[in-house]
């Protein structure tokens, strides 16, 4: 190992996807960057199914070609079966973005090593087997015990230990990026602002199989990953084929219920894993077929968490160091890369004097929080359906599949709302958010739902915005729908692709050699609608038909 420098401009703690990506982007700007990774590469990690956005993000640091030529399993889309009585929905990456819009299923030890080495090839100084033990602050701030400390002071140095020799050292820096994964040294040790999502308090058990069947053989969807809701509504299972000949198969279940079921059946984790697949995941078990289980059962729990802030001046938090939602919809690496790009963009902007550190760090927190919240809404609404399979939330009553629902989900499932400079992403993303919100606060009574929708149509037709003859419950249904649909207007929320997302009056400048932030240019017309105008009426799909759903804007 070459000597670790005594000083650098940016220290990146952690060489996983988020840290390596941030380091690559920074180093390509000529910024002196050091990466310290606690483990030795290659090292194991779960989270093997990527989103279509990854290609666009990797292309920015010229890493997409390495992934393309490596031999990972190409992922043309993904199948989701949320209801045992309906055929699975499918999100088609190729239909959405063309024949080269596929993603990959990856062996993370190999994919993460590719990204780590690429950071070095981009000019960063990379060191694995070196763990950061503590961070030192200039003028540290104190808060009462148990209280979060959202600005612990200016970070100036880190103490590290070399795993092999136990030798300790210190490195000074101007900026720090915490990409330490689940450890989350800044959030857990200094800011103390991590919080777990009780609604996603699940446990995951998984392992690897050989000799399994393929999903949809002989079709354009062949060998896509498959996800299935468990038939007792306790969770879901995944089936992800990998290029080394194995298939990753996992089960995610409510933690309390899983513990109870294991105790009642007197099963250990391995027995419980196989019992779940055999009894309440029939379609996935059919895909396993005569496959052979070739690993131990691995377990993770309490893995869904977030934080109130992902930065403070001279510090940025990225990826799992800040938050993790759930394996569903494969959001982990996408959030790691987009937050890594945000960290690099805002640090570069600060170094170039385009913004001060207060604004730069705030921009990063808002950007990371926005991406996290969008995926959280999707995942929560999906769990609503998984845990109430006889009360459709994502599909209309007369549908036999979830294709329409997932056409709304498409920009988030594929990550294109953050990665692609696509004019449609605003409209598509708003549809997704509106749809997720509608699912998140469902109207239990079908008659109330129908009456509310009819009244909303009448309000548009009569031009008064008045909903006549509604009961309190029906009015509540109207409010549930309309409150979330307000996201379509410019004065409430604007969510664009990463390259056009304006936060605090600044948008990213995603150009190598001048990466940073620039002032938002004046736009002609209003920004509320997808075509540059505020929509006076919004719509929802009901039983396959588009229905105006909003009152007139005043």
Curated annotation (Swiss-Prot):
Induction: Expression is induced on AF medium. Coiled coil: none annotated. Pfam families: FAD_binding_3. Pathway: Secondary metabolite biosynthesis; terpenoid biosynthesis. It comes from the Eukaryota. GO terms for molecular function: FAD binding; flavin-dependent halogenase activity; monooxygenase activity. This is Flavin-dependent halogenase ascD. The lineage of its organism: Eukaryota, Fungi, Dikarya, Ascomycota, Pezizomycotina.
